[in-house]
Amino acid sequence: MNAHTAGGHALRHDWTLSEVQALFALPFNDLLFQAQTIHRAHFDPNEVQVSTLLSIKTGACPEDCKYCPQSARYHTGLETERLMEVEKVLERAREARANGSSRFCMGAAWRNPKERDMPYILRMIEEVRGLGMETCMTLGMLTADQAARLGAAGLDYYNHNLDTSPEFYGEIISTRTYQDRLDTLEHVRGAGMKVCSGGIVGMGEQAKDRAGLLMALANLPRHPESVPINMLVKVKGTPLENEANLDSFEFIRTIAVARIMMPASHVRLSAGREKMNEQMQAMCFMAGANSIFYGCKLLTTPNPDENSDMQLFKRLGIRPAQRAQKPDQIQEEEILAEVSRQNAPDEMFYDATRPRAGVARS
């Protein structure tokens, strides 16, 4: 068996489709009991990691992902925005930290980052880390060199989802291959960063495709440290705007099976949460979800606001996880970040609405 042990449970990388389908087929209570038992062996069951996601460059993406309102191929009414100024990103990061987030995720609607944008991206990473927060980015596909530069700047996590099963993937995206995604994850690992990778359910896939997605994730050489499970957010103007709703229990089953297959990973209750009532969210936490995105938007789609999240946490006895860092270390990093900012050359900060002379921005 291809496995190693963590917390008393074997971390497997050799799942078969029939095994995963058997988990999905368990009676609901049995499935949740198994998932919760495994969850408690690896995590505090009443602690949830809280992240904030900011779109640092919005819209005009050349890809054709059928679920995505940021694709330039679909008319969704989304207002495109250029790459944000570094200081504006830091303002949002400070707000996120004050509201309880321990991780700040930055997303750009690109096929892949351009060289002209890399200095600003690297500066964002360094400055946000200086606030004492974990950093995560999703910028599209990466070369090995780009991944190495992000890692050297201190990026903690890189998000690149597999989206769905290899078999269903071609029904959703044609502008990049499944192997392209796997290659990017390999580059991220090679650069020493942690992997955030999951998928979207409710896109018209079959049950075997949800099983296939989780199998692809769990059979990676190393499990992703973070596994976001997204419910499709149907946006008018995208090809999936009229897709039928996925059964709520099927979504909860997906969370539970992800927890069983990847025991030591954070399973994130991600997009689509705004449409879930409190009871469904509570069942997802029982099934093993222990991470959420926090705030009013997930890139370009709605998300529950901070107050409703904290009220639900209080009712459930859940508390936000804190980054393992001493207060004096955070204070020291803040001072160093402020000194660095004051001494930085002006050209590192720019108005994203006014391209710098001689530089075209996408």
UniProtKB/Swiss-Prot annotation:
The family database entries (CDD domains) matched by this protein are listed as:
Radical_SAM (cd01335)
Q: Which Gene3D superfamilies match?
A: Aldolase class I
For this chain's record, the cofactor binding note is: Binds 1 [4Fe-4S] cluster. The cluster is coordinated with 3 cysteines and an exchangeable S-adenosyl-L-methionine. Binds 1 [2Fe-2S] cluster. The cluster is coordinated with 3 cysteines and 1 arginine.
Q: Return the PROSITE patterns for the record.
A: RADICAL_SAM (PS51918)
Alphabetized UniProt keyword annotations: 2Fe-2S, 4Fe-4S, Biotin biosynthesis, Iron, Iron-sulfur, Metal-binding, S-adenosyl-L-methionine, Transferase
Q: What EC number(s) has UniProt assigned to this enzyme?
A: 2.8.1.6
**SMART domains named in the record:** BATS, Elp3
Among its keywords, does the record have Iron? yes
Question: Annotated Gene Ontology MF terms?
Answer: 2 iron, 2 sulfur cluster binding; 4 iron, 4 sulfur cluster binding; biotin synthase activity; iron ion binding
Indicate the transmembrane segments per the record.
none
Q: Which GO terms describe its biological process?
A: biotin biosynthetic process
Q: Which Pfam families match?
A: BATS, Radical_SAM
Q: In which pathway does it act?
A: Cofactor biosynthesis; biotin biosynthesis; biotin from 7,8-diaminononanoate: step 2/2
Residues that bind [4Fe-4S] cluster: 61, 65, 68
| Disulfide bond entries | none
Source domain of life: Bacteria
Broad class of enzyme this protein falls into:
transferase
Quote the record's binding site residues for [2Fe-2S] cluster: 105, 136, 196, 268
List the catalytic activities from the record: (4R,5S)-dethiobiotin + (sulfur carrier)-SH + 2 reduced [2Fe-2S]-[ferredoxin] + 2 S-adenosyl-L-methionine = (sulfur carrier)-H + biotin + 2 5'-deoxyadenosine + 2 L-methionine + 2 oxidized [2Fe-2S]-[ferredoxin]
Quaternary structure? Homodimer.
What the protein does comes down to: Catalyzes the conversion of dethiobiotin (DTB) to biotin by the insertion of a sulfur atom into dethiobiotin via a radical-based mechanism.
Q: What is this protein called?
A: Biotin synthase
Which organism's genome codes for this protein?
Aeromonas salmonicida (strain A449)
